[in-house]
């Protein structure tokens, strides 16, 4: 299901402030409560106000005046327009109704005709209940929903609300009992992001590091790998520090690339320096190639300049491999020349095989001409010529007159 976007989160924060202000104002005013029909009419009018500031202020004011007696009136206004009404209009009402009558709110949300709004409403109702009232009750509601998409929506709301509580150990135990699969993965991702946002990255790290290494259905591994990828986009240097604590641990394998790629988006030179600081292994090799590929797409000129200045070694080899593969379709001759710059003979020969096979299928004569002039051993030259011929049909023999 679609999760709330960052812009929606900003609206939610704005609305929360507006609701708090309006509630305080309402408590000090002598205005009488709205009945069901008055609430329906007021909401129907509010959702059509074109000015955004006035629109949001009016919606927040009405949500602050919602009671168990008039909540159905708000729902009566939303129901005919549910397909087009915006989620930030629904959000304060779902929360306010859940506060005064969670069962009625959830029941009405499940009747909405729009599937996307049903999912949104279920997530927000369960979230608000878990956040403000009773995690145990939120669990009962969430677990009572059996339709797959809505069940996922409910569990996401439960994870988000629970993750803002003081009972993260209880959340760990619960996640450990959830069947492994997409729903648990979504819950873990949402819980990680929520803890990082509201309690800070260090609290997220403390929570995951405190999970048992074994048991809970491999929760620690899943939570760590997911959180590392999430935090790498927010603060790659912080993520790199966390990853360094578990160098060599099986559950942290193949995660160098998860830090390197987001870091490349921010500062490829820093990402490259970090890769150079690590002991070279298969993880670093893969990350170096992937980092180089990303950098080439972002700024090929800067990448080429950095490559020319790079120190000899296996990371430079990985960068040369990535550059060669980038060039192979548009400039196969340049790709082959680049492959010759790879220091490792094994990697150099493997890359030449791949390039010449690809080039030979499209332009066997040009590939053969390059091969004739390349500084290669006779044995390798003949092997590569045979590969070209096997994929393109008969070609002139190496060294034959043209």
Which residues does each PLM region occupy?
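Non-catalytic tandem-repeat scaffold regions and their flanking low-complexity/translocation tails
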Residues: 22-402
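Bacterial N-terminal signal peptides
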Residues: 9-20
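Bacterial N-terminal signal peptides that target proteins for export
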Residues: 1-10
